[in-house]
Amino acid sequence: MKLTNKIKELLCIKTDIEDILFSKKALKKHMLKRNHHDALKCLDNLDEIIESPDYVGVNPREQAISVEYVKCYENNVLVAIKINIDNNNFYVASVYTIDEYKLNKHIRIKRLKKFDKNE
């Protein structure tokens, strides 16, 4: 998986790093610890969410590059991606659901931007 140039341009991210890695086992353990049980079923859809998100954004609370991918299924799923400068890649830090209110709020304040893979 890769952080595409199209998403970098949309979000004004300046880095040559593009590879996105994740360990399904470690991510599942993290999700269970954080009580993200409702998003566990989406682990098999990570490629789809990252390759074709409905919305993308940058987490303003993180000092380093942190990208958010959102896919609207029955429940809205957010995949948080963080940069690992030492290893020269990005990694999936967390996966969880966000409710419609929070999704709309993030769109309204422009934290999330609509993404169309075909544009």
Give residue ranges: language-model regions.
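Ribonuclease/tRNase effector modules and their secretory precursors
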Residues: 1-119
